Amino acid sequence: MAQFFQAKPNKSKQLSAKLSLSVTQLDHLGAGIAQHQGKIVFIPGVLPGETATVQFVEQKKSYAKAKLISIESASVNRIKPHCPHYQQCGGCDLQHMDTNAQREHKQTALVDLISKLSSAKAIDADIVADPIVGEAWHYRRRARLATLFDKNTQRLQLGFRAGNSNKIVSIQQCPVLSESLSALITPLAANLNQLKAKASLGHVELTQADNGNFAVLRVTKVLPASDIRWLTGFAEKHQLNLLLQDDAGQLTQLFPLLPAGDEAIALPYYHLAQEAVRCSFTPGNFVQVNGAINQAMVDQAIEWLDPQSGERILDLFCGVGNFSLPLALKAAEVIGVEGVPEMVQQAKQNAIDNQLDNVTFYHADLSADLSTQTWLGKIDKLLLDPARAGAFESLQWLQKMQPKKVVYVSCNPASLARDSSVLLASGYRIAQVGLVDMFPQTHHIEAMVLFELNI
């Protein structure tokens, strides 16, 4: 068979070409979806119903990625972003979308993913719960600010990482951070730039707790006494609980000053008011960033799990006891299991502080089979709140224990959908599913699903 030369497509021309596309929907990561020559095209920054001029940035066999050049026809759900750093800072990616439209999209994306990626049939509308929603702005009670020392200018940058980059975007305020923490950013940056050892500063972790605002400053070297005095004065002026953290993770409290001989630092804490529980935590411990939504989420989890006075409940990936402690007020016994030893120790202390003697915490490898552990025993109900990777390994042995109800809290609907298949194949059905709008202005989806054992 004769062979003829065929010129290969010019990829640089394909990528540089601009074209007009119509957006039909958003994917679960918040990117717009359009079609071009039989390919799906993903376009960040656009909304369903819009026509946009775009430029390809990546071409694959079955899909392409493009960047937005301009909006030709705008959606009624498009709004002006609140933040001057939007699309530079990597924190928010949906500020251009009306808040109610964001929630509708997330709820739809959640249900679609569970239907498509798990073995579930179409999710009936009557088991889709109303989304848990709260304030759209100034909702974050915690943030980590990155620092970068510029040797040329001798200035310290303070801000957030740019999207998909290590570059730091200097910021003056943040509209999703609590107002009191947002107001600290500019004076904090100015203060840190007055230090002699500013090149030795790492990130800054800001936390708004029920007992005040906290700042933990990472340092790579011991600071001179003049810098300590300067930082202490700043903390006193702003009534800020200020701690230093060295490379070994050791914390030193600068303000308020500790009494002579007292080494116990003041820890931030939050209350779960409905359950009259107080949760203390240390820097590095995971806590939900949205306090109001966390309270509503805990309330709904308890309502769905419906703990009874004679039941034993397992809380896997329990953290510092966010669910375990309030569950212990209703159940006969709660067992909390966590993979991070420091959080297990804090959870144990929280149980003591709340005078709860029917909750026990254990440190374990959460990817291992724990069914043979003598402390586990019979489990009546189960609560899971894993990290983004999900709980696939844990469910291999958990489903054999056949708890009557399982409440699965997830920050990744894709791993939630995958894990749902394990439970559905083990005799469970989805009884409730709902969005938890933990992260407004971002594409991130928090969700809760109730599984019930078919009897």
From Swiss-Prot:
Swiss-Prot/TrEMBL catalytic activity: uridine(1939) in 23S rRNA + S-adenosyl-L-methionine = 5-methyluridine(1939) in 23S rRNA + S-adenosyl-L-homocysteine + H(+)
Biological process (GO), any one: rRNA base methylation
Positions bound to S-adenosyl-L-methionine: 288, 317, 322, 338, 365, 385
InterPro entries documented for this protein: 23S_rRNA_MeTrfase_RlmD, MeTrfase_TrmA_AS, MeTrfase_TrmA_CS, NA-bd_OB-fold, SAM-dependent_MTases_sf, TRAM_dom, U5_MeTrfase_fam
Keyword hit for Nucleotide-binding: no
Domain of life per record: Bacteria
CDD domains: AdoMet_MTases (cd02440)
UniProt keywords, alphabetically: 4Fe-4S, Iron, Iron-sulfur, Metal-binding, Methyltransferase, rRNA processing, S-adenosyl-L-methionine, Transferase
Active site residues per record: 411
Pfam family, one: tRNA_U5-meth_tr
Its biological purpose: Catalyzes the formation of 5-methyl-uridine at position 1939 (m5U1939) in 23S rRNA.
HAMAP family: 23SrRNA_methyltr_RlmD
Protein name in UniProt: 23S rRNA (uracil(1939)-C(5))-methyltransferase RlmD
UniProt lineage: Bacteria, Pseudomonadati, Pseudomonadota, Gammaproteobacteria, Alteromonadales
Gene that this polypeptide is encoded by: rlmD
